[in-house]
């Protein structure tokens, strides 16, 4: 895992260990993208839209899925897949 200077490998590992829901990972991804000053604009309006797309696509879900799905718990493998994409994106 490579990480930006602000988002460390430990931070990413902590996310897998401690975060639980899709909502948690969208919020975490927004924070990572902002901390790494990631440019958005290729189809995403802002960091929230980019984070939502990244997380939902990783889980093979429509970004416009019912809001109740955001409170679904994730498997460790799903969490790791999201963190791996965050690492690549930042």
Describe each PLM feature range:
Residues 2, 11, 49, 53-90:
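Conserved AdoMet
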Residues 2-47, 78:
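Non-catalytic nucleic-acid substrate-recognition regions in nucleic-acid-modifying enzymes
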């Amino acid at each position: 895992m490579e990480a930006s200077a602000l988002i460390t490998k430990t931070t990413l590992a902590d996310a897998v260990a401690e975060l639980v829901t899709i909502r948690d990972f969208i919020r975490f991804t927004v924070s990572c993208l902002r901390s790494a000053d990631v440019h958005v604009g290729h189809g995403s309006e802002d960091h929230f839209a980019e984070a939502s797309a990244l997380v939902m696509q990783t889980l093979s879900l429509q970004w416009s899925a019912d809001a109740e799905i955001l409170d679904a718990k994730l498997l460790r493998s799903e969490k790791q897949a999201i963190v791996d994409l965050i690492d690549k994106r930042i």
